[in-house]
């Protein structure tokens, strides 16, 4: 339904259904079941563009312990204008997940990038007191969305991609111009804590373990340190894990990896008392050979090495793929392969058959230390 803010808040009582006492029991041979045996939650993104596929829904219900709406909780989906909220798409996914005993993550209360903000925000008249109006818009949005879903969402990506990965500087948006990017981030987290006091609050970004991502890693550490120093309620870092995506045209395959620097980064993050989540795992296979058997083997090996490292940290208790089947990957529309072949970035192929990447994820879970 499309609703005003008042009616959106009024609908909270109807949504306040209890979370399942325990997640739906997964078969011991499913990814969700193998992960659960080690104290880890496994899940995937689910969006309306693939939600209508009953076979894909069934795959998610079978393999996953939780799902995250792909775009349906973002500003562009929930806010057609400054006065209106539209939760129809997000409600369908959350309702389905609850009926199937699955947990839900929320993504994202603020995508701090001008490119991904709705046009109406960029064109909004902030009036004679732009600072107050920017704060009102942001607070109203976070409070309404987080408050609506807090009964059934136990982890929110509060702020997503606030940093320019090339410069290391905080991005500027229509909301941050009147009050500053640091204030915007603080307001988002503090409002989320008020609206969802029991939820895990996450800063989510795409810094990675490649040697040419040092600027991004350093900037993320600086941001997290500043948030902790100001007492901003951030609980965890979401590591997107789009492996190979940023520099996928490199002739060096999936890139020069700097495991030592990555471990140093993760040590510093966890040293702040923050948990880790793998939030958007996939592997961009553009630089890999066309031969499917070899390509799948390379993707699987890369995935296994990455997850072994991430899961060596007991603070990593959630692993999410950004999709389960190649048919619906966002990477299909991102930098086509030079040979024109379909990409194979996910654990199941376009026909939803398991691939070596699925086996690699299962093996990484099985080998992971048990979480306390």
PLM region descriptions:
Residues 1-19:
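N-terminal secretory signal peptides and thylakoid transit peptides that target proteins
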Residues 20-45:
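C-terminal segment of N-terminal export signals and the immediately downstream linker at the start
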Residues 36-91, 96, 103, 110-123, ...:
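N-terminal substrate-binding region of glycoside hydrolase catalytic domains
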Residues 49-61, 139-145, 215-226, 303-306:
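Short, acidic/polar
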Residues 67, 97, 156, 237, ...:
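Conserved, mostly hydrophobic/aromatic
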Residues 68-71, 92-178, 182-208, 285:
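Substrate-binding cleft and catalytic face of glycoside hydrolase catalytic domains
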Residues 148, 157, 162-178, 253-268, ...:
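Aromatic-rich peripheral "rim/lid" segments of glycoside hydrolase catalytic domains that contact
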Residues 182-187, 196, 200, 217, ...:
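Glycoside hydrolase catalytic-domain groove-lining segments
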């Amino acid at each position: 339904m499309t609703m005003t803010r008042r009616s959106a808040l009024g609908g909270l009582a109807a949504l306040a259904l209890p979370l399942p006492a325990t997640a739906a029991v997964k078969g011991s041979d499913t990814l969700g079941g193998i992960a659960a045996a080690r104290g880890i939650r496994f899940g995937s993104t689910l969006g309306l563009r693939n939600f209508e596929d009953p076979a894909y829904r069934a795959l998610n219900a079978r393999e996953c312990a939780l799902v995250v709406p792909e775009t349906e909780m973002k500003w562009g989906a929930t806010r057609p204008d400054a006065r209106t909220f539209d939760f129809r798409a997000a409600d369908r996914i959350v309702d389905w997940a609850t009926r199937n005993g699955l947990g839900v993550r929320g993504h994202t209360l603020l995508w701090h990038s001008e490119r991904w903000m709705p046009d109406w925000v960029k064109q909004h008249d902030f009036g004679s007191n732009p600072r107050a109006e920017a704060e009102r818009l942001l607070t109203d949005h976070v409070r309404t969305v987080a408050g609506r879903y807090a009964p059934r969402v136990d982890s929110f990506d509060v702020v997503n991609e606030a940093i320019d990965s090339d410069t290391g500087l905080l991005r500027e948006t229509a909301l941050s111009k009147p009050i500053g990017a640091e204030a915007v981030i603080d307001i988002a987290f503090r409002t989320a804590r008020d609206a969802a006091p029991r939820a895990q609050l996450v800063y989510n970004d795409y810094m990675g373990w490649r040697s040419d991502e040092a600027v991004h890693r350093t900037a993320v550490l600086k941001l997290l340190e500043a948030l902790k120093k100001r007492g901003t309620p951030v609980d965890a870092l979401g590591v997107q894990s789009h492996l190979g995506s940023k520099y996928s045209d490199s002739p060096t395959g999936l890139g020069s990896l700097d495991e030592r620097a990555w471990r140093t980064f993760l040590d510093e993050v966890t040293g702040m008392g923050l948990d880790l989540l793998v939030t958007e795992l996939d592997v961009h296979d553009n630089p890999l050979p066309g031969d499917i058997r070899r390509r799948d083997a390379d993707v699987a090996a890369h995935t296994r090495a990455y997850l072994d490292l991430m899961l060596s940290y007991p603070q990593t208790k959630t692993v999410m793929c950004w999709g389960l089947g190649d048919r619906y990957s966002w990477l299909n529309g991102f930098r086509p392969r030079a040979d024109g072949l379909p990409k194979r970035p996910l654990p199941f192929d376009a026909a939803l058959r398991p691939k070596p990447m699925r086996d690699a994820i299962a093996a990484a879970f099985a080998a992971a230390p048990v979480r306390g």
